[in-house]
Regions:
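Membrane-proximal interfacial segments on either side of biological membranes
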Residues: 1-17, 23-30, 42-169, 174-403, ...
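A short, well-structured beta->alpha microelement
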Residues: 407-411
Length: 474
């Protein structure tokens, strides 16, 4: 039985067809001593024995092929042999060449009865081996095309094995990832539909990887949120995919696991308006969700981070720790020279990234920094433990609200909130309570006014000596 028209493949051209054989005495068997089928893309020879002869009974078939089109050879794959796999490959293979192939079938009467009943045939009754080159495969209409595939196929009565020796993943627009090795397995052909188990390793550019993730099928599966136009770097990845071989696959039918690394990674607007540079990131994806851990420069500051997305969720959670020193502050236009000396550590945990509103908690660790007049009268030496805690809300326009901002230390006490614009510029600070000296009972506010800020202080008691000293020294 040749491949049906349902596959959409063109007919096979055969220029030479010859069959030689004889009928055994008593009409007990038909022996095909030679079978030849040759054409522009086909070079097949074979023999067969049907019936009782040579001390056996049943069907025995042998086919040898060389330098033939893969689709043409697929037409000689008997329809009763793992039909689901045959149908899947017939619809998925676009092109390729078989350098050599052999097919041997040996069915006794019980095996023939299994074929007639459409039951599973004995595993050792079939041996199909094929070496292929320059193969093109479309695993599913929603997945990227595999091209330039090199490998070998081995099929038995109950198992299918394909070893991939190399190839590429074509993500479109000239973007490709290199497949270094891989396997395709069907461990039990008795299942309906049969289940494919695929493992492969690939390497390439991070922006090409991001393009693959945006294919129709993959973007519905938990994957790293990368924009190809804003991503650069390198990627190496090991991927495992399992799915039933049936028409009209859905994302929920596909089980994907992946483990790999992105290096020298740059992602524009990785966290809001801030970019990640020189990133080294480990990615782990499973049916349970996605975990990303890495380090690099975020907003120009050395940072470590992790991000998690549960399977089926549309938002992600993240933890970030950044070290902000004088150089980073200067680049970001934060004028603290002489007021803050030494690095400060900013850490925050965010929930709901990718949603309409992101919320979280933050902490600013001042332990390694000395302060001299950042707020008039506030001084502290480096090495003394001091932390500021706050809650975070990031709005859709990427403006940031810092609420419940608290610093409680013998050198200062403040409680209030702050607003940072989508451009990263501090817009306002409102302190419901501010104490620099023991007798202070005031509130304070800071508002952006042109190129500077307007400061207001109200309250019952304020030791103004620090303010006057600060004003005279400025």
């Amino acid at each position: 039985t040749i491949m049906t028209d349902a596959t959409g493949h063109p007919p096979i051209t055969i220029d030479h067809l010859a069959v030689m054989g004889n009928i055994e005495s008593g009409f007990k068997a038909v022996r095909v001593t030679s079978f030849e089928a040759h054409g522009p893309e086909l070079n097949v020879n074979g023999n067969a024995l049907i019936g009782a002869a040579d001390g056996r009974d049943g069907l025995k078939l042998e086919i040898i092929a060389k330098q033939s089109n893969a689709l043409s050879l697929l037409a000689f794959w008997p329809s009763f042999l793992v039909p689901e796999v045959r149908s899947y490959l017939g619809q998925s293979i676009i092109g390729g060449s078989a350098t050599e192939a052999s097919y041997r079938l040996d069915l006794d009467p019980s095996g023939l009865r299994a074929v007639i009943a459409k039951d599973v045939i004995p595993d050792n009754a079939v041996a199909l081996d094929l070496n292929f080159t320059n193969g093109t495969l479309q695993p599913d209409k929603g997945l990227p095309t595999l091209k330039k595939m090199e490998g070998k196929v081995h099929v038995t009565g109950q198992k299918v094995s394909i070893d991939i020796l190399g190839g590429t993943i074509d993500s479109g627009n000239g973007r490709v990832l290199t497949i270094t090795d891989g396997t395709y397995r069907v461990f039990d052909t008795s299942l309906i539909p049969t289940v494919a188990d695929i493992n492969f390793h690939f390497a390439g550019a991070a922006n090409d990887f991001a393009t693959v993730l945006r294919s129709d099928m993959m973007r519905d599966i938990s994957t790293p949120p990368l924009d190809p136009e804003k991503t650069s770097g390198n990627v190496t990845m090991a991927v495992k995919i399992g799915f039933p071989q049936k028409p009209d696959l859905k994302p929920s039918d596909i089980q994907v696991s992946a483990e790999g690394d992105l290096t020298d990674l740059t992602v524009e607007n990785a966290f809001g308006a801030e970019s990640l540079e020189n990133g080294v990131v480990h990615v782990s994806a499973s049916p349970q969700g996605l975990l990303i851990k890495g380090e690099g420069k975020l907003a120009g500051a050395p940072a470590k981070f992790d991000m998690h997305q549960q399977n089926g969720a549309t938002t992600r959670d993240a933890n970030v720790v950044m070290t902000i020193d004088e150089t980073v502050r200067e680049k970001k236009g934060i004028k603290t020279a002489g007021l803050v000396n030494g690095p400060v550590t900013l850490s925050f945990s965010l929930k709901g990234i990718g949603g309409k509103r992101v919320k979280g908690k933050g902490e600013l660790d001042l332990t390694k920094a000395s302060i001299n007049g950042l707020i008039p009268g506030w001084t502290r030496p480096a090495g003394k433990s001091e932390k500021a805690n706050f809650s975070i809300v990031i709005s859709p326009d990427e403006s940031i609200s810092l609420d419940d901002l608290i610093i409680d230390d013998p050198s200062i006490y403040l409680k209030g909130k702050a607003e940072i614009g989508s451009d990263g510029v501090l817009r306002s600070v409102n302190l419901a309570n501010l104490r620099i000296n023991a007798t202070d009972k005031v509130s304070a506010s800071l508002e952006k006014a042109g190129i500077g800020y307007k400061i207001s202080i109200q309250g019952d008691t304020l030791d103004g000596r620090a303010l006057i000293k600060s004003a005279l020294s400025s």
